[in-house]
């Protein structure tokens, strides 16, 4: 055997290398198996918030005043101090039988989801509102010249 090849016993294989290679293969295999369980869990993680859909309809054509929560306030005090940061206010036309739909992403819709609609006519426009959270109807209300849907008492 040429000088510098092999180990002290003259063997080409060094037992230290033989033991190290299977350990490295086992480590890589174990790490791959562990990550394959983690990556799908990360991909399935819940989104940051809940998809909230507000729908308003009426039986008459009119200019409606609509307000809905578009973002979670950090507290009721923050909301009371400046509700315009969290609630959208619109003065918009609405056609009888044609729904107006607005969406928001809220972290805590059971605390903050609300939509109101009102309008003035000599005949009540018969408003209807609905709140859907993550595809499930959670509130539905009917009203005459105005209506409010919320997930908690205001």
From Swiss-Prot:
Top-level taxon in the UniProt lineage: Bacteria
Signal peptide interval: none
InterPro entries on file: UCP021591
Positions of transmembrane segments: 23-43
One Gene Ontology CC term in the entry: membrane
Membrane topology: Single-pass membrane protein
UniProt KW keywords: Membrane, Transmembrane, Transmembrane helix
Compartment annotation: Membrane
Predominant location: membrane
Keyword Transmembrane helix among record annotations: yes
Protein's name according to its UniProt entry: Uncharacterized protein Rv2576c
Record lineage: Bacteria, Bacillati, Actinomycetota, Actinomycetes, Mycobacteriales
């Amino acid at each position: 055997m040429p000088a510098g090849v092999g180990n002290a016993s003259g063997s080409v294989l060094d037992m230290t290398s033989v033991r190290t290679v299977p350990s490295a293969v086992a480590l890589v295999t174990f790490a791959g198996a562990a990550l394959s369980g983690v990556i799908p869990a990360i991909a399935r993680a819940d989104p940051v918030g809940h998809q909230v859909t507000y729908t308003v309809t009426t039986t008459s054509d009119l200019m409606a005043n609509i307000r809905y929560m578009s973002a979670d306030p950090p507290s009721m005090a923050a909301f009371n101090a400046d509700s315009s940061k969290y609630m959208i206010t619109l003065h918009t036309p609405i056609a009888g039988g044609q729904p107006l739909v607005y969406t928001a992403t809220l972290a805590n819709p059971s605390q903050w989801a609300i939509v109101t609609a009102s309008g003035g006519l000599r005949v009540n426009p018969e408003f209807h509102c609905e709140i859907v959270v993550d595809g499930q109807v959670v509130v539905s209300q009917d009203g005459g010249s105005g209506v409010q849907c919320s997930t908690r008492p205001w």
